[in-house]
Curated annotation (Swiss-Prot):
It comes from Escherichia coli (strain SMS-3-5 / SECEC). Hydrolyzes diadenosine 5',5'''-P1,P4-tetraphosphate to yield ADP. Belongs to the Ap4A hydrolase family. This is Bis(5'-nucleosyl)-tetraphosphatase, symmetrical. Pfam families: Metallophos. The gene is apaH.
Amino acid sequence: MATYLIGDVHGCYDELIALLHKVEFTPGKDTLWLTGDLVARGPGSLDVLRYVKSLGDSVRLVLGNHDLHLLAVFAGISRNKPKDRLTPLLEAPDADELLNWLRRQPLLQIDEEKKLVMAHAGITPQWDLQTAKECARDVEAVLSSDSYPFFLDAMYGDMPNNWSPELRGLGRLRFITNAFTRMRFCFPNGQLDMYSKESPEEAPAPLKPWFAIPGPVAEEYSIAFGHWASLEGKGTPEGIYALDTGCCWGGTLTCLRWEDKQYFVQPSNRHKDMGEGEAAAS
């Protein structure tokens, strides 16, 4: 029995299947962890969702910002952008089934035995694990309820960007969503910066990557995350695993086998299904 952690798939179905074949993933015996952003940008979002859903208890995933955006498009709140290549999924006969399954997926995965935590963007240093659990449950409860379109309509925005237990209502839910699915940089006090997307070396002072600011979760648990392709899987402290290596941008899809910490990569097919110039310009 092995545990395989894979970074953001972004609709790159062929690469996902090739990578799983490479590591000899066996559903029912092995477990697959996925860092979120299953969909958008790659050509196979529909196939990715169908496959991941079919794995049942053999998969543990978290929602990413692109997954939430897909749900907002599905609910008629956001516009379907051609660059996301979501139309085949939205028009599929099983779209309702797939997307109602997707909105019931978690924002946070925890394995106490492995001392492993996974969230799409990471864990804000302002939270301990109990707070992270409670916050994840708050958003998950709304997403799985009949009122989920109301939340999706209100989730867009960058404020509030500083955690307080006193946060209430939609502001609280928006902060939680941003922390779990959009966070990259923080100010030294842990306050979120929602604007900078560059590599840590290029970020303006005093911003730091969230994982460079001491927090209680990282003291006791390993943290796996995706979301930040420009890290290229590098530059994180021991016990922090950055798994998004930009497959949908022409990079690779990365897998970490947890038991021996061995990495496996599958090169992107992006240059094969579009012109080199377009891929380079993305």
